Amino acid sequence: MAKGKKKTSQKWKLYEVKGGKVVRKNKFCPRCGPGVFMANHKDRWSCGRCGYTEWKK
């Protein structure tokens, strides 16, 4: 196992404040439900929890 500092979670990057309201930047997974974000890749959206993938057109 590598020694050193752990990488911090950067959940603050997934939210934005507009007009006094919190706006989510990424999509939620349709299988897992609200609270589980999908990762935004170049050609797809993918869920790290269940593996669901949506391909971009």
UniProtKB/Swiss-Prot annotation:
Zn finger (C4-type) start-end: 29-50
Cofactor dependency: Zn(2+)
Keywords noted in UniProt: Metal-binding, Ribonucleoprotein, Ribosomal protein, Zinc, Zinc-finger
A molecular function GO annotation: structural constituent of ribosome
Database matches in SUPFAM superfamilies: Zn-binding ribosomal proteins
GO biological process, one term: translation
Any one GO cellular component localisation term in the record: ribosome
Entry's family note: Belongs to the eukaryotic ribosomal protein eS31 family.
Protein name as it appears in the record: Small ribosomal subunit protein eS31
